[in-house]
Swiss-Prot record:
Organism name: Caldanaerobacter subterraneus subsp. tengcongensis (strain DSM 15242 / JCM 11007 / NBRC 100824 / MB4) (Thermoanaerobacter tengcongensis)
One annotated GO biological process: lipoprotein biosynthetic process
E.C. designation(s): 2.5.1.145
Pathway listed: Protein modification; lipoprotein biosynthesis (diacylglyceryl transfer)
GO function terms (MF aspect): phosphatidylglycerol-prolipoprotein diacylglyceryl transferase activity
Membrane topology according to the record: Multi-pass membrane protein
PANTHER family listed in its UniProt record: PHOSPHATIDYLGLYCEROL--PROLIPOPROTEIN DIACYLGLYCERYL TRANSFERASE, PROLIPOPROTEIN DIACYLGLYCERYL TRANSFERASE
Protein name according to UniProt: Phosphatidylglycerol--prolipoprotein diacylglyceryl transferase
Binding site for a 1,2-diacyl-sn-glycero-3-phospho-(1'-sn-glycerol): 136
Amino acid sequence: MDIPSLSPYAFKFGPIAVHWYGIFMAISIAVGGYYLYKQATKLNYDEDFLLNLLMIVVIFGVIGARLMFVLANYPEWFVKDPVQVFKIYEGGLSWHGAVLGGFLAGLYYCRKKGVRINPLEDFAVVGLALGNMLVRVGNIFNHEVLGRPTEFFFGRWPAQLVGVAIGAFLLIRYFYVQKKHMPDGYQFWSFIFYYQLLRGVFEETVKDVPLVWPVYLNEEWGIGLFTMTQVATPFILILAYWMIKRVLNDPNRQYYD
């Protein structure tokens, strides 16, 4: 299966090029931020607080995403070619870095203002799931996050489409669970759990990335174990599961409609 010859540029204005990757990321941020804002105002969160929170989370989310990607893949850029670190428009963001950076910044700001974060992190799931789905589409245009070659009839695993499917499934799951009246905090941590499980099992197994712990590699089938993400998966699953149990067993747990 040949990789389609798609341009990474949506359009150009002279020397300025607008990338599909950036457009899809901006759409996910805008839609996710708008959803969080509308839902949180229904719970009487202050509008100015929410706007400031969204700005802080987006900024530190992008910073965290880029820094973790560079640290994991091209740490030499910091010394040999630091300009490359800032070329976000060319792609190269870590989903885990985005979540970590945005979460820590949001947690700090909420605690500083004395505001409960659990409902807000639940509402953020829409932006996270949509972002994973759309950014993987952007990866297709950038010709990155490729699957491994395989001797199956399709020639190469469509790793980006696997990521799109994971994001779509988790987005649908969010709205389904939202009808179940679960305690606040459950949506976010269950999302983290299932995202990591699905990505570690399905996407990473066929993605053409180095195996940091090469336990198994079948070049004919195009599958391999274990990538860096897969090595980290058990620890993330344990953390997410522990947080889920904590939310469900909290005697002071709260609910929202």
